[in-house]
Amino acid sequence: MKTNLNILPILCFLLLWSCKSGNASSQTKNEVSQDTIKTFTLPAIPQIMVAPEQRAEFLVKHYWDNVNFADTNYIHHPEITEQAWVDYCDILNHVPLKTAQEAIRKTIDRTNVDKKVFAYITDLADKYLYDPNSPMRNEEFYIPVLEAMAASHVLEEIVKVRPKARLELAQKNRIGTKAINFTYTLASGAQGSLYQLNADYLLLFINNPGCHACTETIEGLKQAPIISQLIKEKKLIVLSIYPDEELDDWRKHLNEFPKEWINGYDKKFTIKEKQLYDLKAIPTLYLLNKEKTVLLKDATAQAIEEYLMIHQ
């Protein structure tokens, strides 16, 4: 199924929604109960709420109020349910993180009345919030889903093994926590550690040589003026790490990396074997501050550049 990811800007979306909600709420209860799967009925936002922030928060908290998650017919109408989920994930970005996480957990808990519905909604969460190829990927939004799955009474214990493992990995190196230390080795054989590096910012770049996305990211970082400036001013260190075994391939591609970067590899494969960092998506970028606290996790080169421009 193809879903529509070209969603209106949230300001227009929220300002126009009162009219749509009002029309939906004017339907008779009989119409809604008889036809719950032909349309998705949004909650009516109180007219007293005029600020976009207020309207977004109300909508996030009450988005699914008109959905009966015990009705398994929703599973068979992805053009309604999946599109509603995509729109919901977009709105989550316009409320505080804590509000978004509480709303997601409440939503998933509500689906915990039926195993099929629970599996369907959590699969949607996996598709849009966890899949490395999803433009809406957001680990902080996905964590409440994993927590709900681990605590669910409709899932067998064997089914909970994967979400529990994912939850454990997702809770490592979260924004606001200290990044996990590790040792790296240079082509010369010299070694160092993450915690030994001293600068206002540290950009950890975990990558594989020759991968298309890695090459694009390297070019994006090289062409970002703010990154070049901060490296020159010794306020930023870029630590590029190869986590795998094919060292010959890594050495062949070393000339693609700027000499100003620290280019190393994980000699004992500790990052991968002990799952110190989530490697489901390669490349992956972490921006750390002087204390090695994570500022950005699994970010794009553009997001790194924008953050540094604002906070330099």
Q: Where on the chain are the PLM-derived regions?
A:
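Short active-site neighborhood of thiol/selenol oxidoreductases, capturing the structured segment around
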Residues: S193-L221, I237-L239
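Structural microenvironment flanking redox-active thiols in thiol-disulfide oxidoreductases
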Residues: I218-N255, F269-K274
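Oxidative protein folding and maturation machinery
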Residues: S21-A190
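Bacterial N-terminal signal peptides that target proteins for export
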Residues: M1-L8
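Short, glycine-anchored, charge-dense loop/turn motifs used at functional sites
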Residues: G189, C211, L288-V294
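Non-catalytic, surface beta->alpha helical segment in thiol-disulfide oxidoreductase systems
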Residues: A281-T284, K290-Q312
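C-terminal motif of bacterial Sec signal peptides marking the signal peptidase cleavage site
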Residues: L15-S18
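Short, internal strand/loop/helix patches
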Residues: L254-Y286, K290
